[in-house]
Amino acid sequence: VSVPFPEPTEHVSTRTEVYLRYLAYFRDGVGRRVEAMTEDEARRSRVPSGWTPRELVRHLTFMERRWFVWGFEGTPVDDPHGDEVDGRWVVPDEVGTADVLAAWRRQAEVTEAVVRRHDLDEVGRPSERWDGEPPATLERVLLHVVQEYARHLGQLDVVAELGGGVTGEV
């Protein structure tokens, strides 16, 4: 069952719920597209920059860790940029796409727990994530992550369409 698009007129009790619903919608789109691919399709790049769908999912996993755990909560994490080598997304060959998706889903649960523990106006803790800048509020972090998901889902739509897979609002 797919997550419905959160309509602007839909009654939602809090701003936090609005952000979490949009995030769930975009996550659902990413998951359904990659789950519909064969292992070979998920490992295949169809774009000049060379990324694969499974690399995109792993990037999203690490991106959420960087913003919510390492950044906002200020909790040290092992290898916060473990999704990249020389600026390019990577997944070790021996790691299957199902494992990449499972790690992404676990991180989504962590992210939701972080968001629910804090108020949107709360400012993150100082950490290396902020690169010397003052930490952002949780709302700004959420907005950034929602837009990153929307952008990457659009990119994944193109890749899925080129491979004859699931696209659009389905």
Model-identified regions with their sequence ranges:
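Short, contiguous alpha-helical
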Residues: 2-9, 16-87, 127-170
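Active-site rim elements
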Residues: 13-19, 97-101
